[in-house]
Amino acid sequence: MMPNRLEPELDIYQYPEHLRACLAPLPKGPGVYVFHGQSESLPLYIGKSVNVRSRVMAHFRAQGEAKMLRQTRHISFIETAGELGALLLEAQLIKQQQPLFNKRLRRSKQLCALRLQADTVTIAYAKEIDFAVTPHLYGLFANRHAALEKLRAIADEHRLCYGKLGIDKLPAGRACFRYSLRKCAGACCGVEPTQEHARRLGAALEQLRIACWPYAGRVALEEQGEALRQYHVIHNWFYLGSVSSLAQAQRLQSAASHFDSDGYKILCKPLIAGDYRIIELP
């Protein structure tokens, strides 16, 4: 069957005839959209946009997506109040439904961070402590190797001692090898005071600090769009869901089951910056 055009002004977009009815109602506002194949329980692709219609149309001019489009039977969408709600819902749905053509978003069993206590750095794992409420954690890493690679990079940039950081073993009574190369400031041999090394380490890590959850419990984050207002319910950086009223938000009592690194990355900056109205929930 020959492809058809949806609208004259959008003649660059081509689409299979059977998708005409799905494309017509797509909104020009923010939301999440889903490409469905034959299976109703396993979507092909889940995406989000501040303009759902425009983004979905763009899929039809991407040559690399021809395989997915051939399998698409219909397209659904969920409108949101704004971009933040779309980001949160997309991440939640991808993890829940694992669409075939999305990059997998799974809870990492090895999710870890650098933990600074006094002048000692260790690797802390999210499966062992709650990152949402534990202070002095820095960076979010998929595994121990990634965390140590970042620590090495920080040490190299700031002339910190591998031995003091636990990356290498220190030779008894001698300076580390990197000190002879002028890549270490000498905390290993007394040239740099231990307190100064600890201060510089803390300063170097600061940009990676994981913010502790700043509220006593659940909150509702209000997002107002042109035609829709939503309350996104969050607890310990974990997205519990979105509702249309505070009464519904108070009834949304699901507990955060684990530290959600995706939720943290989406929410931390706008929440701490005060970009949205926050209502603490009982």
Language-model-derived ranges and their functions:
Residues 2-44, 48-282:
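Conserved catalytic/ligand-binding micro-motifs in nucleotide and anionic cofactor chemistry
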